[in-house]
Amino acid sequence: LFASNSSLVAAKVAERSAETGEHYITRTAAEYRSMVKKAAGGGLVIAFTTLAKFALYALALSAFWAGFWAGFNYAVSFVLVQLLHFTVATKQPAMTAPAMAAKLKELGTGDAIESFVDEITHLVRSQVAAVLGNVLVVYPVVLGIALLMLHTLGQPPINTKQAEHVLESLHLLGPSVLFAAFTGVLLFASSIIAGWAENWFVLHRMDSALHYNPRITGLLGAERAARWARFLRENLSGFAANISLGFMLGLVPAFAAFFGLGLDVRHVTLSTGQMAAASATLGLQVLQMPAFWWAMASLPFLGALNVSVSFYLAFSLALRAQNVSGVDRARIYAAIRARLRTAPLSFFVP
C-alpha cells in the first residue's frame, strides 16, 4: 500500500513539474534571447543577495541564526526573482527533467529519436544560456558595488582574511565539487516540495475555495478574489520551491556542522558573486594569486554539478513515476553522439 501510494504521489508531483518544466526549454532564437535576459535579471538580484550575505557575516550571529537569516535572505531573493519573471539557472533542471521523461514515452521510430535529441539540444543550450546569463552579470555587478563601497566608505564588503578564505573555499581541488553535487540534491528536493505543494493545492481545489469562499469574496470582492486564486494557482509551486531551497541552503550547513558532518553548499551563481567580492578586496594582485585561478576554474564544475545532479535525480524519479521502460538507450546515445559530431554548436546556440 505504501509503495503504491508513494508511486502515485511521485507520478502527480512529476506531472506538475513537467507542466512547469516546459516553460524552461527554449526552442527558438527569440526564446533563447529571452532566457538570457531573464537569467541576466536573476544575476542582478543575486548580486545583492551576495552582498546581503556578507552583511549578515558582520553581525557575528550564532550558527543557527546565521543559517536562518542566510536562508531568509536566499528565500526572499529567489521569490523576488520569480515575481520579476527572471530566472536562476540551477533551479531549472529539476523542473525540466519530468518534461523530458514524458517525451520518452513517445519514442519508437527513428524520427522520434531525432526529435528527442532535438529536445536535448534545446534543453542543454537553455541551461547554458541561463547559467551564463546569471554568472556574467553577478560578477561585474558585485565587483562594481564592492569597489564603489571601497572608494566611498573606505572599506569593501569583506576584509582580506575573509576574501582569502572565499578563494580557498572554492578551490577546484578541495571539497567544493562535492558540495556542489550536494547542492544539486537540495535543488532536487526543492522541486519535490514544489510539486507536492502544487499537487495539494490542485487536489483540494484551493483556487475554487479562494474564489468562492463567502468571507474572502466579502472581504476582497469577487473579482479580486478570483485574481488572487489565479495568482496562487500559477505561482504556488514557485513559492514553495524558492522558499524551501532558500532555507535549505542556509540551514542545512548549520545543522550539518552541529552534527559534525562538515557539509556545505556551493551554488554557482552565489559562489561567483562571492569571488567578485573577494576580487574587489584583494585588488589587482588577485590576478597573481594561484588560489584565484583555481577558484575560477572550479566555477564551470560547480555549475555542471548543480545542474546535472538535480536533473539526474528528477529524471530518474520521473521515469519511475511515469512507468517509462523499454527505452532503447543505445540508439539515443548514438543519436546524441552523432549530433555532437555533426552540429556541436547546436548544444550552445540556436
Give residue spans per PLM region.
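Long, compositionally biased intrinsically disordered regions
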Residues: 1, 7-14, 23-26, 205-350
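Core alpha-helical transmembrane segments of integral membrane proteins
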Residues: 15-112, 126, 130-151, 181
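Extended hydrophobic/aromatic-rich secondary-structure runs
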Residues: 1-20, 71, 115, 175, ...
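Generic detector of multi-pass transmembrane helix bundles and their immediately adjacent loops
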Residues: 73, 91-93, 97-100, 105-274
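Alpha-helical transmembrane segments and their immediate juxtamembrane interface regions
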Residues: 38-41, 45, 49-52, 65-86, ...
